[in-house]
Amino acid sequence: MQPRVLLVVALLALLASARASEAEDASLLSFMQGYMKHATKTAKDALSSVQESQVAQQARGWVTDGFSSLKDYWSTVKDKFSEFWDLDPEVRPTSAVAA
């Protein structure tokens, strides 16, 4: 073989090797980017789940406090007006007797 042909073949082999290395680097880079996107999404999902749980606990507390206040208010109203509701069976309003 002529030296020029050998030189061209060697340069082509070197160029092909460099391209293959770039393809591997690009594929590794895209793999790592995909992995980081997945890890970021997982972390965000976990954080939002914890925050939703805390919000749900706070909302349950508010609802419980609201029902407790309503129950206390109803008890107070019931006690104040119980004298009107508890009529003595012996004391009945008199009705006019027609003669």
From Swiss-Prot:
Main location: secreted
Record's comment on post-translational modification: The most abundant glycoforms are characterized by an O-linked disaccharide galactose linked to N-acetylgalactosamine (Gal-GalNAc), further modified with up to 3 sialic acid residues. Less abundant glycoforms are characterized by more complex and fucosylated glycan moieties. O-glycosylated on Thr-94 with a core 1 or possibly core 8 glycan.
Localization in the cell: Secreted
Span of the signal peptide: 1-20
Keywords of the record: Chylomicron, Disease variant, Glycoprotein, Lipid degradation, Lipid metabolism, Lipid transport, Secreted, Sialic acid, Signal, Transport, VLDL
Record site: May interact with the LDL receptor: K37, K41, K44
A GO molecular-function descriptor: lipase inhibitor activity
Gene Ontology CC terms, in alphabetical order: chylomicron; collagen-containing extracellular matrix; early endosome; extracellular exosome; extracellular region; extracellular space; intermediate-density lipoprotein particle; spherical high-density lipoprotein particle
Alphabetical GO biological process terms: cholesterol efflux; cholesterol homeostasis; chylomicron remnant clearance; G protein-coupled receptor signaling pathway; high-density lipoprotein particle remodeling; lipoprotein metabolic process; negative regulation of cholesterol import; negative regulation of fatty acid biosynthetic process
Protein origin, superkingdom: Eukaryota
Region Lipid-binding, residue ranges: 68-99
Annotated disease: Hyperalphalipoproteinemia 2: A condition characterized by high levels of high density lipoprotein (HDL) and increased HDL cholesterol levels.
Role, per record: Component of triglyceride-rich very low density lipoproteins (VLDL) and high density lipoproteins (HDL) in plasma. Plays a multifaceted role in triglyceride homeostasis. Intracellularly, promotes hepatic very low density lipoprotein 1 (VLDL1) assembly and secretion; extracellularly, attenuates hydrolysis and clearance of triglyceride-rich lipoproteins (TRLs). Impairs the lipolysis of TRLs by inhibiting lipoprotein lipase and the hepatic uptake of TRLs by remnant receptors.
Name of the protein described by the UniProt record: Apolipoprotein C-III
Species name: Homo sapiens (Human)
Gene name of the encoded protein: APOC3
